[in-house]
Curated annotation (Swiss-Prot):
Gene: moeA
Lineage: Bacteria, Bacillati, Cyanobacteriota, Cyanophyceae, Nostocales
UniProt remark on cofactor binding: Binds 1 Mg(2+) ion per subunit.
Protein name according to UniProt: Molybdopterin molybdenumtransferase
Known role: Catalyzes the insertion of molybdate into adenylated molybdopterin with the concomitant release of AMP.
Entry-linked Gene3D superfamilies: MoaB/Mog-like domain (3.40.980.10), MoeA, C-terminal, domain IV (2.40.340.10), Molybdopterin biosynthesis moea protein, domain 2 (3.90.105.10), Molybdopterin biosynthesis moea protein, domain 3 (2.170.190.11)
Listed PROSITE patterns: MOCF_BIOSYNTHESIS_2 (PS01079)
Annotated stretches, region: Disordered: 1-24
GO molecular function, one term: molybdopterin molybdotransferase activity
GO biological process: Mo-molybdopterin cofactor biosynthetic process
Native organism: Nostoc sp. (strain PCC 7120 / SAG 25.82 / UTEX 2576)
Top-tier EC class: transferase
Family as reported in the entry's similarity comment: Belongs to the MoeA family.
Catalyzed chemical reaction(s): adenylyl-molybdopterin + molybdate = Mo-molybdopterin + AMP + H(+)
Keyword terms of this UniProt record: Magnesium, Metal-binding, Molybdenum, Molybdenum cofactor biosynthesis, Transferase
UniProt pathway annotation: Cofactor biosynthesis; molybdopterin biosynthesis
Length: 436
């Protein structure tokens, strides 16, 4: 999509830019609802691709998959033991065992070509095809074999330990509905049904860039006042973790023209655009101005949340029309806002019908938790199993939104709602579970 930039900002860079007109900050819940409702409905004809089953792990089905086979494919044994005719053994027990002639051995993968006659049994192994005439399996622990005869030491149930053909599903049965994520169990089902390829939604393309004159790449020597751009690495890892394809646009300086060119390229090549930095109200935060000049509708400019107050959410009027998510610049705030808002968008846009929403659980807090109560506050830490119950342990050290060191082992975020300033040790707290 080629957009003519009408975003020439010719003012003196030291002249204060117009501030956004005051609008009340939406709550975190309202913000999430607004963002999630912006995710477009996928087209199962256009937004898809065919992949081999070997490459399908983590992908999302675009269409239902029906079985072409009965499963099991044939009557087979669920145990190592003896295939028998129930009418021969229905009165057998340990005190008066029935004796049967063992006429064959049936290993797995062998097709028996005989019929069990009255008074006969066949040694059989788990998964092996039942012989004609046999309708019950007696597990070997309930038998005693002497030479070519077997003694049945129990009273079996009719049909016991026999898996009947098509007992699990018949040819034509829907195995998996559309919008199912394919993991090990789902792939096993498809493989057992001889399904070599599947139609899946293509991976969402996510453009990522960072803004700021102070940013440098990790291979550049640091000068006073400079910091390494860690956000792009973190966001790319999170995007991949959620089944999407990151497209990296690097570092963009605090220059309206450069920023406009980058955003134009990003929205032409991606389904979601994520930027970090440049969305606050400082003199060098240009993102909202550029978006407006490109015709974007800005839905959100900030959120009642700590960390992560600066947040820009925008959409574009003409296709391709990606969702723009402008995150804060501070590294911890980037991660928290990604987990709370961006991750569900990627998963929903990837085709998940359910399971894309954030997962909140209530657990016991091991530590005292504090907030000023002015915004919904997210405190990072980890869940530990203690005496059979999960506890939230607050990460040690500084919880400044610029500090990364204690985020490394985080697997949960404790949530203190707006107006709540304190949760004492041992009390319940709501936590957002994070992907491991």
């Amino acid at each position: 999509m080629q957009n003519k930039l009408s975003c020439e900002v010719k003012r003196n860079p030291h002249t204060p830019k117009p501030l956004h007109p005051y609008t009340p900050m939406p709550s975190v819940r309202d913000t999430a609802n607004i963002i999630f409702n912006l995710v477009p409905k996928l087209d199962s004809q256009q937004d898809t691709e065919i992949v081999d089953l070997w490459a399908a792990n983590g992908r999302i089905l675009a269409t239902p998959v029906n079985s072409t086979l009965d499963f099991p494919h044939w009557d087979n044994s669920a145990m190592d033991g003896y295939a028998v005719r129930y009418e021969d053994v229905h009165n057998s027990n340990a005190e008066q065992p029935v004796s049967l002639e063992v006429v064959a051995e049936i290993p797995a993968g062998y097709q028996p070509k005989f019929t069990l006659q009255p008074g006969q049994a066949a040694r059989i192994f788990t998964g092996a095809v039942m012989p004609s005439g046999g309708d019950t399996v007696v597990m070997q622990e309930k038998t005693r074999q002497e030479n070519n005869r077997v003694f049945i030491l129990t009273t079996p149930k009719p049909g016991e330990f026999v898996r009947l053909k098509a007992a699990y599903y018949q040819a034509g049965t829907q195995l998996l509905p559309a919008n199912t994520q394919l993991n090990a169990a789902e792939i096993a089902i498809l493989a057992a049904s001889q399904c070599p390829q599947v139609k899946v939604y293509r991976r969402p393309r996510v453009a990522i860039f960072s803004t700021g004159d102070e940013l440098v790449t990790l291979d550049q020597p640091l000068q006073p006042g400079q910091i390494v751009d860690s956000n792009q690495y973190a966001l790319a890892a999170l995007v991949k973790q959620n089944g999407a394809e990151p497209i990296l646009f690097g570092i963009v300086k605090d220059n309206p023209t450069a920023l406009g060119e980058t955003i134009s390229k990003a929205i032409a090549n991606a389904d979601i655009v994520i930027s970090s930095g440049g969305v606050s109200v400082g003199d060098y935060d240009y993102v909202d101005q550029i978006l407006a000049s490109l015709g974007a509708k800005i839905h959100i400019r900030s959120v009642e949340m700590r960390p992560g107050k600066p947040l820009t959410v925008a959409t574009f009027p003409t296709p391709p029309a990606p969702i723009y998510l402008g995150l804060p610049g501070n590294p911890a705030a980037v991660l928290v806002t990604f987990w709370r808002f961006v991750q569900p968008v990627i998963r929903k846009l990837g085709g998940l019908a359910k399971g894309w929403e954030p997962v909140f659980v209530k657990v016991r807090s091991h530590d005292e938790l504090h907030s000023d109560g002015k915004r919904e506050t997210y405190i990072w830490g980890s869940l530990h199993l203690v005496d059979g119950l999960y506890e939230f342990h607050k990460a040690g050290g500084s919880h400044s939104s610029g500090n990364l060191i204690n985020l490394a082992q985080t697997n949960a975020l404790a949530v203190l709602p707006l107006g709540e300033t304190f949760i004492s040790s041992g009390k319940d707290v709501l936590v957002l579970q994070l992907p491991i």
